[in-house]
């Protein structure tokens, strides 16, 4: 019982501390459609200056693994990439609608098999070269490099019609394709031809609102305003500096002292300590991000007890996720029942999360043929997510209570960059922790990313039934019919869990009151071309 007693004592202490120091959190603003919206919490808008001015300091919760678009493995990498590179279209932060960017118009074949894009003319890259159709071709050619984290996302076939028209054909019809394209950042054909992906990695050249200056590893990434940006009057900032600060408490101190202007992934106690601070505003919203412990049946988990669905059900029942959420997040998270969240199309609110029931867990293990439990390896990243190391340790302790112990006696904790590389190479242990967001408004990319077998870099599981359901969802363009398919999938994945489902967090960000025009979103994605500083 020592693991259980230790964990409960630890969580009890955290709850006592939370009750002592944490006032009620800032309210969450939610739009009529159910999407989280923190826009109402912004400072009053002031008119931006005529030309770029001011230096915005942004804290990152971890060092990006890469700033080459197809290789950026995490949201922090993406937040730097998004300022340097543009995509063919964008998602409007306020409305959630698809809007033109490097493409001014597009047509979609009735069966979703072909997309034709009309490209914006007069756009230049940061080195002065002209943007045209060849750059779209180069983007997909560069992305296909198997060394990239998201190589499988670049499978579609691109063809040039003329200098400012391209067609893109997905391998199979995909209802989320246009929204995925809003995440596909366009690189320079000239740079790729001359320098390859290595050149893009060391000094990326895009068409975005900010251009790359330098990256001092462990210290800062410096960007400066693109003076020839195609979106007239933007950006408003002269400079953006990203500061990787892995320790949450250090990020808190940095926003308190004015060293940085924006921080995210604060915990609830840290956010509460900022409430009422004169120059700092706290914004909170439900994140469209699911945390989980993956089961691996592709490589390291082959032939292990976790291939038995009763074992996987048992492990879900073994973990008291509510105690973890209460103890480590002051209750500011929703327990997950699957990979479709309340803001996603087709969410089934009738499906309850696995109940904490260690006796049922033991009974299921016995029924599966493992009455004495077993030993298994588990890994988690360090510094990637709020309190995640503590979450992983708590899970290991709960599993030990039903006889499932860690190989080597402990969870393997790895630096996040090393961790993502091992995850992409399918070299992590049979259990590993991670999270997925879904920036397209529904869960399909998240589901594909984690469950597409050996085809996707960060997937861990393959199930022919799930594969068939996902293929059907991707090819169903009627929203009502697709929502029904999502519900079928959720029920199947609850009975045949490919993960230990954990939680969907409430996100806490803090911004300096001088920051104007900043609109957070549910996937923690920064778009800074509209931001200015009131100095």
Annotate each language-model stretch with its function.
Residues 116-118, 150-192, 214:
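Surface-exposed binding/hinge segments that line
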């Amino acid at each position: 019982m020592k693991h259980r007693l230790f964990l409960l004592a630890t969580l009890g202490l955290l709850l006592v501390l939370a009750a002592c120091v944490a006032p009620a959190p800032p309210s969450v603003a939610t739009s009529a459609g159910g999407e989280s919206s923190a826009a109402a919490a912004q400072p009053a808008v002031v008119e931006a200056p005529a030309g770029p001015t001011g230096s915005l300091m942004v804290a990152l919760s971890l060092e990006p693994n890469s700033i080459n678009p197809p290789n950026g493995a995490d949201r922090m990498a993406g937040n730097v990439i998004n300022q340097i590179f543009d995509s063919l279209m964008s998602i409007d932060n306020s409305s959630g609608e698809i809007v033109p960017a490097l493409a001014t118009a597009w047509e979609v074949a009735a069966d979703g098999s072909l997309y034709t894009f009309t490209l914006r003319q007069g756009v230049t890259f940061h080195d002065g070269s002209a943007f045209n159709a060849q750059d779209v071709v180069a983007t997909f050619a560069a992305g296909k490099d198997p060394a990239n984290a998201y190589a499988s996302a670049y499978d579609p076939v691109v063809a040039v019609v003329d200098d400012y028209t391209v067609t893109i054909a997905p391998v199979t019809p995909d209802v989320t394709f246009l929204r995925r394209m809003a995440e596909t950042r366009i690189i320079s054909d000239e740079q790729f031809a001359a320098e390859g992906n290595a050149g893009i990695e060391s000094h990326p050249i895009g068409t975005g609102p900010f251009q790359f200056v330098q990256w001092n590893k462990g210290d800062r990434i410096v960007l400066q305003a693109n003076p020839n940006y195609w979106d007239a009057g933007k950006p408003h900032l002269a400079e953006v500096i990203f500061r990787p600060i892995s320790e949450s408490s250090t990020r808190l101190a940095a926003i308190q002292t004015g060293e940085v202007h924006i921080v995210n992934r604060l915990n609830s106690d840290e956010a509460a300590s900022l409430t009422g601070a004169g120059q700092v505003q706290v914004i909170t919203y439900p994140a469209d991000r699911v945390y989980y412990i993956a089961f691996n049946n592709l490589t390291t988990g082959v032939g292990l007890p976790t291939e038995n669905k009763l074992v996987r059900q048992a492990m879900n029942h073994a973990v008291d996720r509510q105690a973890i959420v209460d103890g480590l997040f002051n209750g500011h998270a929703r327990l997950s029942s699957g990979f479709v969240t309340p803001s996603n199309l087709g969410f089934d609110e009738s499906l309850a999360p696995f109940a904490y029931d260690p006796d049922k867990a033991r009974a299921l293990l016995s029924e599966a043929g493992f009455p004495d439990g077993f030993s298994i390896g588990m890994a988690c990243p360090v510094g990637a997510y709020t309190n995640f190391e503590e979450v992983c340790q708590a899970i290991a302790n709960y599993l030990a209570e039903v006889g499932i112990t860690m190989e080597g006696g402990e969870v393997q904790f790895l630096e996040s960059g090393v961790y993502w590389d091992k995850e992409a190479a399918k070299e992590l242990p049979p259990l590993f922790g991670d999270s997925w967001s879904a920036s397209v408004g529904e869960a399909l990319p998240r589901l594909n990313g984690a469950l597409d077998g050996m085809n996707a870099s960060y997937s861990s599981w393959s199930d022919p039934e799930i594969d068939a359901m996902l293929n059907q969802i991707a090819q169903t363009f009627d929203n009502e019919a697709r929502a029904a398919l999502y519900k079928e999938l959720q029920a199947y994945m609850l009975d045949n869990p490919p993960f230990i489902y954990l939680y969907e967090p409430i996100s806490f960000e803090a911004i300096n009151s001088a920051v104007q025009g900043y609109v957070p979103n549910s996937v923690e994605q920064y778009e800074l071309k509209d931001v200015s500083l009131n100095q």
